[in-house]
From Swiss-Prot:
Lineage: Bacteria, Pseudomonadati, Pseudomonadota, Alphaproteobacteria, Rhodobacterales
Matching InterPro entries: Alpha/beta_knot_MTases (IPR029028), RlmH-like (IPR003742), tRNA_m1G_MTases_N (IPR029026)
Residues that, per the record, bind S-adenosyl-L-methionine: 72, 103, 122-127
SUPFAM superfamilies assigned to the protein according to its UniProt record, in alphabetical order: alpha/beta knot
Cellular component terms (Gene Ontology): cytoplasm
HAMAP family listed in its UniProt record: 23SrRNA_methyltr_H
Reactions accelerated catalytically: pseudouridine(1915) in 23S rRNA + S-adenosyl-L-methionine = N(3)-methylpseudouridine(1915) in 23S rRNA + S-adenosyl-L-homocysteine + H(+)
Subunit structure: Homodimer.
Gene3D superfamilies, per database record: 3.40.1280.10
Protein name: Ribosomal RNA large subunit methyltransferase H
Record has Secreted as a keyword: no
Keyword S-adenosyl-L-methionine (UniProt): yes
Described purpose of this protein according to its UniProt entry: Specifically methylates the pseudouridine at position 1915 (m3Psi1915) in 23S rRNA.
The family this protein is said to belong to: Belongs to the RNA methyltransferase RlmH family.
Organism field: Cereibacter sphaeroides (strain KD131 / KCTC 12085) (Rhodobacter sphaeroides)
Length: 155
């Protein structure tokens, strides 16, 4: 299994990057004994200014062939953290590669959303795409702790 996080744009150094790196490192430490791979973070830049369509092309090219495509989108399913952990365990157990895709400031092109195996939402509010990375990295770590039976996730 390969786990990719494909995100449009680059995080500059600062608190958002620090948080993403911290949560992905925690995920790797917690997930490795569970058979979860380290997350491959792919920061994609549309240098030609082609908007959502060009960004969709970049994401599509970055996704491993045959990988399950999971897009973050405000119209997606709202999952609880345990439900997200169940999805992660299912992907791990099936051995299928997974690509989590975060669009740019304007979101994802409809053709990419339509192609996705799963669209998930972090709630009904719209979030800046740079913060979505932090929130998704934390949810990956949280999912690993749920699968490990750690007390990090409290309800």
């Amino acid at each position: 299994m390969k786990l990719q996080l494909c995100a449009v744009g680059r995080l500059r150094s600062g608190p958002e990057r620090d948080l993403v790196e911290d949560y992905l490192a925690r995920f790797e430490r917690t997930g490795r004994p569970l058979g979860l791979p380290a997350v491959q973070l792919l920061e994609l830049e549309d240098r030609k200014g082609g908007g959502m369509e060009a960004e969709a092309d970049l994401i599509a090219k970055a996704v491993a062939p045959g990988a399950a495509l999971v897009v973050l989108d405000e119209r997606g399913r709202t999952l609880s953290s345990p439900e997200f952990a169940d999805h992660l365990a299912h992907w791990r157990d099936s051995g299928r590669d997974v690509a989590l895709a975060i669009g740019g400031a304007d979101g994802l092109a409809p053709r990419l959303r339509d192609r996705a195996d799963l669209a998930i939402s972090l709630g009904r509010m719209v979030w800046p795409h740079m913060l979505v990375r932090v929130m998704l990295a934390e949810q990956l770590y949280r999912a690993a702790t749920i699968l490990a039976g750690s007390p990090y996730h409290r309800v």
